[in-house]
Swiss-Prot record:
Remarks, miscellaneous: In plastids the F-type ATPase is also known as CF(1)CF(0).
PANTHER family tied to this protein: ATP SYNTHASE SUBUNIT B', CHLOROPLASTIC (PTHR33445:SF2)
Transmembrane stretches, start-end: 26-46
Compartments, as annotated in UniProt: Plastid, Chloroplast thylakoid membrane
Primary localization: plastid
Family as reported in the entry's similarity comment: Belongs to the ATPase B chain family.
Gene Ontology MF terms: ATP binding; proton-transporting ATP synthase activity, rotational mechanism; proton-transporting ATPase activity, rotational mechanism
Pfam families: ATP-synt_B
Function as written in the Swiss-Prot or TrEMBL entry: F(1)F(0) ATP synthase produces ATP from ADP in the presence of a proton or sodium gradient. F-type ATPases consist of two structural domains, F(1) containing the extramembraneous catalytic core and F(0) containing the membrane proton channel, linked together by a central stalk and a peripheral stalk. During catalysis, ATP synthesis in the catalytic domain of F(1) is coupled via a rotary mechanism of the central stalk subunits to proton translocation.
Keyword Hydrolase: no
Domain of life: Eukaryota
Record organism: Ochrosphaera neapolitana
Protein name: ATP synthase subunit b', chloroplastic
Length: 163
């Protein structure tokens, strides 16, 4: 028969007699002493080592957390430094690019001015040569005109002299 399926009256009847549910004899203090002794033994054998282990683990975790926090701060600081260096490098690069563009524009302007000067000089030289050729051609034409006019005169006067 199961203890839980018994009615309350039967349970009380069993407890009144010897060997019932509760017997108040030397067993109860002995069990209390065993319980206290077991608690003390477990405290020294089990709970304290586990407590020490947990404390060590907590100290280890806290140490790692503080190290990680310090390293995170250091990494943030390095990141800021690198970003500043990158910003400075970009500014330097932009400055170099601007200087190179200015220098290239100056070189182009100088070469363009030199090319214009050379072209003007060439045009002037060609104009002088053309003027010289024109003068030469005019002198030759004048000489031919003089010869032709002399020839025409002779022919005209020569015909009149024959008439």
């Amino acid at each position: 028969m199961n203890l839980f399926s018994m009615p309350l009256g039967q349970m009380l009847a069993l407890s009144e007699g010897e060997g019932g549910l509760f017997d108040f004899n030397a067993t109860l203090p002995l069990m209390a002493l065993q319980f206290i002794l077991l608690t003390v033994i477990l405290t020294f054998v089990f709970y304290k080592p586990i407590g020490n282990l947990l404390e060590e683990r907590e100290a280890y975790i806290n140490g790692n957390l503080s190290d990680a926090s310090a390293k995170l701060l250091q990494a943030d600081e390095l990141c800021k430094q690198y970003e500043e260096q990158l910003k400075d490098a970009k500014a330097d690069a932009q400055s170099c690019i601007a200087d190179a563009e200015t220098e290239a524009k100056q070189v182009v302007a100088l070469e363009l001015a030199q090319a214009r000067k050379d072209a003007a000089s060439l045009v002037e030289q060609v104009n002088k040569e053309l003027e010289a050729q024109k003068e030469l051609a005019l002198k030759q034409l004048e000489a031919q005109i003089d010869e032709l006019s002399q020839l025409i005169k002779e022919k005209l006067l020569g015909k009149q002299a024959i008439l």
